[in-house]
Amino acid sequence: MSELTTGRFSISDLDNVQITINNIVGAIEKQSDDIDVEMGPTVKPGVSSLRDWDHNILDRYNPVYTPMCDQCCYCTFGPCDLSGNKEGACGINLEGHNAREFMLRVITGAAAHSGHGRHLLHHLIGLYGKDHPLDVGATNIIAPNVQLVTGVQPKTLGDLDSVLSYVEEQITQLLAAIHVGQEGAAIDFESKALHGGMIDHVGMEISDIAQISCLDFPKSDEEAPLADIGMGCLDASKPTLIVIGHNVAAVTDIIDYMEDKGLNDKIELGGLCCTALDMTRYKTGDRTLPRAKVVGTLAKELKTIRSGIPDVIIVDEQCIRADVLKEASKLMIPVITTNDKVMYGLKDRSNDSIEDILEDLTTGKEKGALMFDYVKLGELAPRLTMMMSEIRKQKGIKALPTDEELKELADSCVHCLKCEVACPNSLPISEAMTALSEGDLSKFELLHDKCIACGRCEYACPKDIDIVNVIEKSSQRVISEEVGKVRVGRGPISDPEIREEGVNLVLGTTPGIVALVGCSNYPDGTKDLFTIADEMLRRSYIVVVSGCSAMDLGMYKGEDGLTLYEKYPSRFKSGGLLNTGSCVSNAHITGAVIKVASIFAQKNISGNYEEIADYTLNRVGAVGVAWGAYSQKAASIGTGCSRLGIPVILGPHGSKYRRALIAKPYEEEKWKVYDARNGSEMQIPAAPDYLLTTAETVEEMMPMLAKSCIRPSDNNMGRMIKLTHYMELSQKYLGIMPEDWYKFVRTETDLPLAKREKLLKILEEEHGWEIDWKRKKILSGPTMKSDVSAQPTNLKRLCKEA
């Protein structure tokens, strides 16, 4: 090889020359700007780096498994019967197998988010370049999850690339452990699941800060505009384009084309699932009204298609029904897929002319097309929508049954109840069919909101009744009135908001953060979300929402005719209701907790995961609720919260994830921590007494929310406020005083002021506490001391004597 020499050359006379410089050999890395930043002990942790922390919390919060079957079918040695403590051919037992199953769910969810992030980041770098600056609003901590886990403080799109490579590497290593003949211990499968959950929050954060920075989304904006939501907000008389999925990359070109051609008032543009939320965020950074409407969640997909309203459907990725193409083609609705994760067997038309594609789709020669060229898609989708609207009208495409057909369907029901057995929520379909036969639509109108439109009832029906169609036809009146408001996703919580509220959260005077996240698999419709949020907002909790929960919360109105978004401020403060955005914006919720530790407590967060998780568990009153969780992504989001010390409550369907993390409050030794001031042991309250659990009803969950926000660091005012809510919610929803309320009392000033004397009497008579009645003071009885200067920690190394 010849030796390289120095020299010069000129390109001034050359045309069409492009020079690309990647990494310059010997150049000082840009991160040298942060050379003085102190790094924690776990920068870019591997699978085993935080194992000690995981084992620490798993020692208190024990895994509880609820297997769906006793078999393992992973390899050709099997299937193996693991019941009765038997081992499979590879040596694994039922505990280990179920831990492995849960871990697989978690890393599947993490892969979905990081795959989304990789696709989106690649797309945005192609449009804006690696040097495009990151801007998420008023903050010095742009990416708290990224910084906490990797130590990287990203400033440009290019900085996110290496972090995402780290995420992808970790997911690969975790997936390798799933293979037969690898890990065998349940506790280490659990540790790996927790690692996958943590990694998921990094992947989500990358996805959202990239799109916020490039697509003119609101940036930590508490005054983000309101968007229309609901099937009733669509004007069915116009050509209608519906987008389904979670990745907004393809849709932005459609919105731009429609705006450039003056089509905003001529075409209805609506979305389902998180793409809908991100469509409303696009180009609303200046508080411009959204250009799109939100139709609803996954539970509205089949309903929307069966309505016949869409003229064209675009899908991207995640939470999309596998039968969209089949259902849409019945009604002559072309489907365009835009992402390699969902292709439906369609031909790739990315290199074909728009005219040829229009010809094939409008004539019905093809049911749909695969399109990776988003600029071409931007023109194709609106033009196709307008053409298909006319064609479908001319052909008289009929979707829902007529009134006469509806009566015939109801009369054909034999009331075998097979539909109700198949229904995930056991909805009273047979009773509604009887009422419909008598001309009463009200029973089905009630079922419309509760039906998740999974379609299982139709496959169970021996009379082949399209039950979803019956529900929707019977509910046309309520559907037409289904018009709500949802706050456009505001993005992260700003530094000024954290500075203002951090001290109140740690001391307990703001009783806590309640995060309503996750999917739409609710046991009793969307009203449950309204009930939860309204109750906690009235009690001055901070309520943060995202994804499907954020959408469905806007579907219900109170007696005043307003949604909660219209009643409560969108600021991170006591009594605030914040919509952070789509699924990937969940990272901003954990990010806010991390920022509390950094900004209020002045903790170093760079590569310092264990200490911040310890701080969260002991000091920050926060609880997550995934009331309708259904997906693997919901499992990974919740597990990431668990590792960070944030407890999560799932709805009744959450037991199908097959694993919970539940502590035993009566094991007093498990409820001791160190006081970092001197290393001495201190007793703490048994709260939270789970990191992941399920609740059967809203009534059961309500007092759990208040209890889950109690922390050892509460001052007397904070503990009094939290204990008041815990006791009142238990009495309101369960009709009883909580059995363990007295265990959270350290001194008389912890007691609710209005009931202090009555409660002191109960403490004396029923629990044997000694009371000085003259001064109304507790002399003896509490197992914990009130010491607001105490510094509770699970980590011995953080104690001063260490």
From Swiss-Prot:
Cofactor, free-text remark = Binds 7 [4Fe-4S] clusters per heterotetramer. Binds 2 [Ni-4Fe-4S] clusters per heterotetramer.
Residues bound to [Ni-4Fe-4S] cluster are 246, 274, 319, 519, 548, 583
Q: Report the GO molecular function annotations.
A: 4 iron, 4 sulfur cluster binding; anaerobic carbon-monoxide dehydrogenase activity; hydroxylamine reductase activity; iron ion binding; nickel cation binding; peroxidase activity
GO biological process: one example: methanogenesis, from acetate
Give the main EC class: oxidoreductase
Which residues make up the binding site for [4Fe-4S] cluster 3?
A: 413, 416, 419, 461
- Which reactions appear under catalytic activity for this entry? CO + 2 oxidized [2Fe-2S]-[ferredoxin] + H2O = 2 reduced [2Fe-2S]-[ferredoxin] + CO2 + 2 H(+)
Per its Swiss-Prot or TrEMBL entry, what cofactor is needed? [4Fe-4S] cluster; [Ni-4Fe-4S] cluster
Annotated residues that bind CO are located at 113
Q: Name the keywords, alphabetized.
A: 4Fe-4S, Iron, Iron-sulfur, Metal-binding, Methanogenesis, Nickel, Oxidoreductase, Repeat
**Which pathway does the database say it acts in?**
One-carbon metabolism; methanogenesis from acetate
Q: Which SUPFAM superfamilies match?
A: alpha-helical ferredoxin, Prismane protein-like
Q: Which residues bind [4Fe-4S] cluster 4?
A: 423, 451, 454, 457
Q: Where does [4Fe-4S] cluster 2 bind?
A: 72, 75, 80, 90
Q: Which pairs of Cys residues are joined through disulfide bonds in the record?
A: none
Q: What is known of its domains?
A: Cluster B is an all-cysteinyl-liganded 4Fe-4S cluster; cluster C is a mixed Ni-Fe-S cluster which is the active site of CO oxidation. Cluster D is also an all-cysteinyl-liganded 4Fe-4S cluster that bridges the two subunits of the CODH dimer. Contains two additional 4Fe-4S clusters, dubbed E and F, that probably transport electrons from ferredoxin to the B cluster.
* Subunit architecture: Heterotetramer of two alpha and two epsilon subunits. The ACDS complex is made up of alpha, epsilon, beta, gamma and delta subunits with a probable stoichiometry of (alpha(2)epsilon(2))(4)-beta(8)-(gamma(1)delta(1))(8).
Role noted for this protein = Part of the ACDS complex that catalyzes the reversible cleavage of acetyl-CoA, allowing growth on acetate as sole source of carbon and energy. The alpha-epsilon subcomponent functions as a carbon monoxide dehydrogenase.
Family per similarity comment:
Belongs to the Ni-containing carbon monoxide dehydrogenase family.
> What is the designated name of this protein?
Acetyl-CoA decarbonylase/synthase complex subunit alpha
Organism, per UniProt? Methanococcoides burtonii (strain DSM 6242 / NBRC 107633 / OCM 468 / ACE-M)
User: Which gene underlies this protein?
Assistant: cdhA
